[in-house]
């Protein structure tokens, strides 16, 4: 569509293709928008601050089909606008006249129709100008391309023209050359018509020149074709070679990459190999140094071996010489033995003559029985009958006398070997110190085998006599095959064994002697510090009466009554065969230490009891068990007012307290401190432990406040020092009967035992947790300390098992069965136990002969009945607490593991069970209490009925 304006006025123009005929070029917008057949028109309007930028097409926003929008494009895009140059020029001139119409727009801006018309005209003009510009651009492009093509053709034509000119010049030169050569070859002749001749020669020359040029041109073309073919062939070959070369390069790169990977791995392996080589080099160096050292050691060992071989040869020579000397000494020894036994027989005969006939002392080879025992009488009678019946030859009698002492010594050594001293007995808590002390006391020269020394040995009389009779029978059979004068069977090593035993015995004796000297010095020093040396004690420290001050000895050895006498040094050979006899003083002390209470009230000359004081008490006066003793404060406090067990300060008094010293009787008190092992020998609670305090045979329980101590489980092997700290070593077993206690209680004879600690020693024992007293318990002062009481109670502590709980490996089943049988017997025969226990002892009869005529049952009427609110009896006031409670026996249904046992002395609770092991603990003297372990319950200390007594007789 084209609008042609002339001088600003619209004119009718020729109809253009794509437009309707007869339509004005300038039409109204209404005319355009009224057509309903027009499609949706694409429209875009970019309103920016810059100059308006128009696009001919927009693919995003479509206008609406009504008159508010201009439907563009007015001309179809497919319409071909073919304008002439004149039309285009006139149209552009029309566009240049738009500046003149600006004023018209400003004047008519209020007329919306005029503005709309102007916009429509402007739109159409803009569209037309755009179409014109498109057509001009297309023509310009085609013309530019054609111009470039023509320029290229002109260049080629120019090159061809220059080439042709060059070839033409060359050809011209060649023609001139050929023409000159032809003119020279032709003879000179005068032509009639020279002008014709010249024309003909020039034509021939031109023909020849053209022919040669054509030939050369053909040759050059053929050569050019050949060269092109060769060039194409070379090109193809070059391409193939390049491909091969590229493939080769790729292969080389791949191989190079693989080689790099291999080099890296090989370098890593090389580094590892280098490290291994360095380490191996170090190891080689170290091994070489070790080889050098070992070679040096081997050389030194070789030299030493040679020296040892030489020493061995010398030792063998010396042994041969010593063997020869030993044989000579054996002969001399046999002669000495004969002389010795002859002297012994003479001495024995002289002693038998000098001794009075009334003496009931019968000397046994080992002194196993007391002098006035029935077993000693039977044995002596049997020996006399055997001696009368057997009329042996003098040689046999002499031989028996010679070897009797040696046999006895060997038997003692065998007895000691039954309980090995370095280690504990299996199934016992005893330390090796007791066994070594026992063996040394039995086998040393001046340890007498008469009296109570053997009576207190760990082997009891019955078992020991059975063993020794069996061994004596065996040895008697063996003696028939021996020759006179030989200390054993020929070829035996009796002498070497005896010498070895003597050396070990001497070492053991020296160590024990040093230990006992130190203990004695330390104890004497303690007594001197406490002022005990001024008490006028005339009792020898080695006697049985000094065990009150030497309680540590009895605690250590596990049995009291052993006489620690100083022993002299005798030759080793004489120690083998010398009769083990002591002095008259030793025999006297042995008689005093006999475990019987026959002369309990008899005064003995030269024997002063420590703290001796007569009691100014009327024997006819009757005392109740709940009365107060002399050392009480005098404040009568009833039992319901029991307080806590914390001790309070006790004011010092100048009164003498007889309850804190030994009882005032001229009797011999034997305290057999046996090691009683219960089936519950692990971590148990022992109630009470007397803490190695000397306990009188007769005494009230006024101050016997037992201390609950948590007993640790002692391992099997204890050293010498550990045995002193063992709590169960100090457990005391009283060997007196309960009937004597009642009789002495009724006669007013009483004593007390020092208890250093209060009830709370073990942090409130488990046995007293059910009752809390309300009154402070005043602890009594020890007999060796000044009259002072501590101001405060010591801190409570409890023994704990620091060592691993070893299995005690006891013969617990036999012990348990024995205790079970004893408990069953207690249940069956509880009514007749008191009569049996009293009738089994001659002690009661002896006491009755001294005027104590009251019956045991008479004292029971004074025992008050304890109610449950009074609390445990042991927490009562410090007066004479009742020892028996009329409530029957302690319940029998108590567990076997309870370690507390009620003793026969004043209601003391002791671990008086039964232990069965190799040591055979003996109950010496009077009867030993055999009862099951029971636990102290609230308000019950002991049963009213006596437990069954088992007498050794």
From Swiss-Prot:
It comes from the Eukaryota. Involved in the regulation of endosome-to-lysosome trafficking, including endocytic trafficking of EGF-EGFR complexes and GABA-A receptors. Involved in mitochondrial motility. When O-glycosylated, abolishes mitochondrial motility. Crucial for recruiting OGT to the mitochondrial surface of neuronal processes. TRAK1 and RHOT form an essential protein complex that links KIF5 to mitochondria for light chain-independent, anterograde transport of mitochondria. It is linked to Developmental and epileptic encephalopathy 68: A form of epileptic encephalopathy, a heterogeneous group of severe early-onset epilepsies characterized by refractory seizures, neurodevelopmental impairment, and poor prognosis. Development is normal prior to seizure onset, after which cognitive and motor delays become apparent. DEE68 is an autosomal recessive form characterized by onset of twitching and/or myoclonic jerks in infancy. The disorder progresses to refractory generalized tonic-clonic seizures, often resulting in status epilepticus, loss of developmental milestones, and early death. This is Trafficking kinesin-binding protein 1. Glycans are attached at residues 447, 680, 719, 935. O-glycosylated. Glycosylated by OGT; glycosylation in response to increased extracellular glucose levels is required for and leads to regulation of mitochondrial motility by OGT. Interacts with RHOT1 and RHOT2. Found in a complex with KIF5B, OGT, RHOT1 and RHOT2. Interacts with HGS. Interacts with GABRA1. Interacts with KIF5C. Interacts with OGT; stable interaction is not required for glycosylation of this protein by OGT. Isoform 1 interacts with OGT. High expression in spinal cord and moderate expression in all other tissues and specific brain regions examined. Expressed in all cell lines examined. GO terms for cellular component: axon cytoplasm; axonal growth cone; cell cortex; cytoplasm; cytoplasmic vesicle; cytosol; dendrite; early endosome. Keywords: Coiled coil, Cytoplasm, Disease variant, Endosome, Epilepsy, Glycoprotein, Membrane, Mitochondrion, Nucleus, Phosphoprotein. It comes from Homo sapiens (Human). Belongs to the milton family. Residues 786-796 have a biased composition (Low complexity). The modification Phosphoserine is found at residues 537, 719, 919. Residues 359-509 are annotated as: Interaction with HGS. Residues 47-354 form the HAP1 N-terminal domain. One of its GO terms (biological process) is protein targeting.
């Amino acid at each position: 569509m084209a609008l042609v304006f002339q001088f600003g006025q619209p004119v009718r123009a020729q109809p253009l293709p794509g437009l309707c005929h007869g339509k004005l070029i300038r039409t109204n917008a209404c005319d355009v928008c009224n057509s309903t057949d027009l499609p949706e028109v694409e429209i875009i309007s970019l309103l920016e601050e810059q100059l308006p930028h128009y696009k001919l097409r927009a693919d995003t926003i479509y206008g609406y089909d009504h008159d508010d929008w201009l439907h563009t494009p007015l001309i179809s895009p497919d319409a071909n606008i073919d304008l002439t140059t004149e039309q285009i020029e006139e149209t552009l001139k029309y566009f240049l006249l738009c500046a003149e119409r600006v004023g018209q727009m400003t004047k008519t801006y209020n007329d919306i129709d005029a503005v709309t018309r102007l916009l429509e005209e402007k739109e159409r003009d803009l569209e037309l100008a755009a179409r014109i510009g498109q057509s001009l651009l297309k023509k310009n492009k085609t013309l530019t391309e054609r111009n470039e093509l023509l320029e290229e053709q002109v260049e080629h034509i120019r090159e061809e023209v220059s080439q042709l000119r060059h070839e033409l010049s060359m050809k011209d030169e060649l023609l001139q050359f050929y023409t000159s050569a032809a003119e020279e070859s032709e003879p000179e002749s005068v032509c009639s018509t020279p002008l014709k001749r010249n024309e003909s020669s020039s034509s021939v020359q031109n023909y020849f020149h053209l022919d040669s040029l054509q030939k050369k041109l053909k040759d050059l073309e053929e050569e050019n074709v050949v060269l092109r073919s060769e060039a194409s062939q070379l090109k193809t070959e070059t391409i193939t070679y390049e491909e091969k070369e590229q493939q080769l390069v790729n292969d080389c790169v791949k191989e190079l990459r693989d080689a790099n990977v291999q080099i890296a791995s090989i370098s890593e392996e090389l580094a590892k190999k280098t490290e291994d080589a360095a380490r191996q080099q170090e190891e080689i160096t170290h091994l070489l140094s070790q080889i050098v050292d070992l070679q040096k050691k081997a050389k030194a060992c070789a030299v030493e071996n040679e020296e040892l071989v030489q020493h061995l040869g010398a030792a063998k020579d010396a042994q041969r010489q010593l063997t020869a000397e030993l044989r000579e000494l054996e002969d001399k020894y046999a002669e000495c033995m004969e002389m010795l036994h002859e002297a012994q027989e003479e001495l024995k005969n002289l002693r038998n003559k000098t001794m009075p006939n009334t003496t009931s002392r019968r000397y046994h080879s080992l002194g196993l029985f007391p002098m006035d025992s029935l077993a000693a009488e039977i044995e002596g009678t049997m020996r006399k009958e055997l001696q009368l019946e057997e009329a042996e030859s003098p040689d046999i009698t002499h031989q028996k006398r010679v070897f009797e002492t040696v046999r006895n010594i060997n038997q003692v050594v065998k007895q000691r070997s039954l309980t090995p001293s370095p280690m504990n007995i299996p199934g016992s808590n005893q330390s090796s110190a007791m066994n070594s002390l026992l063996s040394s006391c039995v086998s040393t020269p001046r340890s007498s085998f008469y009296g109570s020394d053997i009576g207190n040995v760990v082997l009891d009389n019955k078992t020991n006599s059975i063993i020794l009779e069996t061994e004596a029978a065996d040895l008697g059979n063996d003696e028939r095959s021996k020759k006179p004068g030989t200390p054993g069977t020929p070829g035996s090593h009796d002498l070497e064994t005896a010498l070895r035993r003597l050396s070990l015995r001497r070492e053991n004796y020296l160590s024990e002697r040093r230990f006992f000297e130190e203990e004695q010095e330390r104890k004497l020093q303690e007594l001197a510090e406490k002022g005990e040396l001024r008490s006028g004690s005339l009792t020898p420290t080695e006697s049985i009466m000094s065990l009150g001050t030497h309680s540590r000895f009895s605690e250590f050895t596990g049995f009291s009554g052993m006489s620690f006498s100083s022993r002299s040094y005798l030759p080793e050979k004489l120690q083998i065969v010398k009769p083990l006899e002591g002095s008259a003083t030793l025999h006297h002390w042995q008689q005093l230490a006999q475990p019987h209470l026959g002369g309990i009230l008899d005064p003995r000359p030269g024997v002063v009891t420590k703290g001796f004081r007569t009691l100014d008490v009327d024997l006819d006066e009757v005392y109740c068990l709940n009365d107060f003793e002399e050392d009480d404060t005098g404040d009568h406090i009833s039992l319901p007012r029991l307080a806590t067990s914390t001790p309070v300060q006790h004011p010092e008094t100048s009164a003498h307290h007889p309850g804190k010293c030994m009882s005032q009787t001229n009797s011999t008190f034997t305290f057999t401190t046996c090691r009683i092992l219960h089936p519950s020998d692990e971590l148990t609670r022992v109630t009470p432990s007397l803490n190695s305090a000397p306990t009188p045979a007769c005494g009230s329980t006024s101050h016997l406040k037992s201390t609950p101590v948590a007993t640790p489980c002692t391992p099997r092997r204890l050293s010498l020092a550990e045995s002193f700290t063992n709590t169960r070593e100090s457990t005391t077993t009283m060997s007196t009967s309960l009937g004597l206690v009642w009789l002495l209680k009724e006669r007013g004879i009483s004593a007390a035992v020092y208890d250093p600690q209060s009830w709370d020693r073990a942090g409130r024992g488990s046995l007293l947790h059910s009752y809390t007293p309300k009154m402070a318990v005043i602890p009594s002062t020890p007999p060796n300390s000044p009259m002072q009481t501590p101001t405060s109670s010591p801190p409570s502590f409890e023994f704990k098992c620091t060592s691993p709980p070893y299995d005690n490996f006891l013969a617990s089943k036999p012990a348990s069965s024995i205790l079970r049988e004893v408990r069953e017997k207690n249940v069956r025969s509880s009514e007749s136990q008191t009569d049996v226990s009293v009738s089994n002892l001659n002690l009661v009869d002896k006491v009755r002969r001294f005027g104590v005529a009251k019956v045991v049952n008479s004292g029971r009427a004074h025992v008050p009945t304890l109610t449950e609110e009074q609390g445990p009896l042991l927490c009562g006031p410090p007066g004479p607490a009742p020892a028996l409670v009329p409530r029957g026996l302690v319940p029998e249904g108590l567990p076997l593991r309870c370690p507390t046992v009620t003793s026969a002395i004043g209601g003391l609770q002791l671990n008086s069970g039964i232990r069965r092991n190799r040591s055979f603990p003996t109950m010496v003297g009077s009867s030993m209490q055999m009862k099951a372990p029971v636990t102290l319950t609230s308000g019950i200390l002991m049963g009213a009925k006596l437990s069954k007594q088992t007498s050794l007789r």
